[in-house]
């Protein structure tokens, strides 16, 4: 009886911890998105310099990552040759810098709610690029689902009250670069047995991003910042914003480490709906019924996609267990046969 109660208490504690990690990740992801919107939007803080903001984040995060790995030794650095770094990490850093630059730029032109709706295209982009790079197998059923997600997002875009073509182009570009980055991580790193958690990712990738972003920054934003009072650095705003960005990476580390990547995907859907509600109720962005209908269709498609991924993972785990039990049975049979032969020899 006591053992059963202890077991149930342990399960309850694990469930509470899992929900706590999910809540922390949703809160921090929510905060970073709204904070970035506040800084970049011309109607709010009015500091429309997305490259500079991204560089501040990368500089802060890479510095803290070095301290956590080299000084406090929170996690071990991954052993990596210079050639592997240049061929694998640098291309990923280039794509990440482009993705962050474009996604932050989109906040200047689009509402938070509409950006979240456009982000629903991420599974479509990841699957399509995966098929093109031969990392995913083409399946007509999966592609039909991807088309339904795209159709839902198209309806949401059609119903957008403050549609901005340039903003949509920036956000779609960010989705495309991010999807390519995710696929390349599998091809260039995971396939080679190199697994980077969010802290080691920042340690290796953030300095790359800083270097790549400095090139467009010198020509696009630096001249404007130099010639205006916008060059004044607000330590409170940018300091707290950078802390939130780094804390979000730690939250991803905790969430994926203690639960799973699929849990993060499901939590991401909840976060998107909360952001849409916040954008409509607090920021007073216009959310039309056509917006919601289109995003609802895309949401169902994304939900079905996540369900299929979960079923595939379960089937894979079950197959591994069957294989393991077969191997164990084979070893037992071999042991019995060898024991029988020994007995025959002794007789």
From Swiss-Prot:
Membrane topology summary: Multi-pass membrane protein
Which SUPFAM superfamilies does the UniProt record give?
Multidrug resistance efflux transporter EmrE
Q: Which Pfam families match?
A: TPT
Positions carrying Phosphoserine: 325
Q: Which UniProt keywords apply?
A: Membrane, Phosphoprotein, Sugar transport, Transmembrane, Transmembrane helix, Transport
**InterPro entries linked to this entry:** Sugar_P_trans_dom (IPR004853), TPT_transporter (IPR050186)
Q: Which residues cross the membrane?
A: 15-35, 49-69, 89-109, 112-132, 143-163, 165-185, 205-225, 235-255, 263-283, 286-306
Q: Where in the cell is it found?
A: Membrane
Report the protein name in the record: Probable sugar phosphate/phosphate translocator At2g25520
Species, as recorded: Arabidopsis thaliana (Mouse-ear cress)
Q: What is the lineage of its organism?
A: Eukaryota, Viridiplantae, Streptophyta, Embryophyta, Tracheophyta
């Amino acid at each position: 009886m006591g053992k059963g109660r202890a077991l149930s208490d342990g399960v309850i504690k694990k469930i509470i911890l899992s929900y706590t990690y999910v809540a922390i990740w949703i809160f921090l992801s929510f905060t970073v998105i709204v904070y970035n919107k506040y800084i970049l939007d011309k109607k709010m803080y009015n500091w429309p310099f997305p490259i500079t903001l991204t560089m501040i984040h990368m500089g802060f995060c890479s510095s803290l990552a070095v301290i956590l790995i080299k000084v406090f030794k929170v996690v071990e650095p991954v052993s990596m040759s210079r050639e592997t770094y240049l061929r694998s990490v640098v291309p990923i850093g280039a794509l990440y810098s482009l993705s962050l630059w474009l996604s932050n730029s989109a906040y200047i032109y689009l509402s938070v709610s509409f950006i979240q709706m456009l982000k629903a295209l991420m599974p479509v982009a990841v699957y399509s690029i995966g098929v093109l790079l031969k990392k995913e197998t083409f399946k007509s059923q999966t592609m039909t689902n991807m088309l339904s997600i795209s159709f839902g997002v198209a309806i949401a875009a059609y119903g957008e009250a403050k549609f901005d073509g340039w903003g949509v182009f920036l956000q779609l570009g960010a989705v495309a670069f991010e999807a390519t980055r995710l696929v390349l991580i599998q091809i260039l790193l995971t396939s080679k047995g190199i697994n980077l958690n969010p802290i080691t990712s920042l340690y290796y990738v953030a300095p790359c991003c800083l270097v790549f972003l400095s090139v467009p920054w010198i020509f696009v934003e630096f001249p404007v910042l130099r010639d205006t009072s916008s060059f004044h650095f607000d330590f409170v705003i940018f300091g707290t914003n950078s802390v939130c960005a780094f804390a979000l990476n730690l939250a991803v580390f905790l969430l994926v480490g203690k639960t799973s990547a699929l849990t993060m995907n499901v939590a991401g859907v909840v976060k998107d709906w909360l952001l849409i509600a916040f954008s409509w109720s607090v920021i007073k962005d216009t959310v039309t019924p056509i917006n919601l209908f289109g995003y609802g269709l895309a949401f169902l498609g994304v939900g079905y996609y996540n369900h299929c991924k979960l079923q595939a993972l379960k089937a894979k785990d079950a197959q591994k267990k069957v294989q393991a039990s077969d191997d164990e049975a084979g070893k037992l049979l071999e042991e019995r046969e060898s024991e029988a032969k020994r007995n025959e020899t002794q007789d």
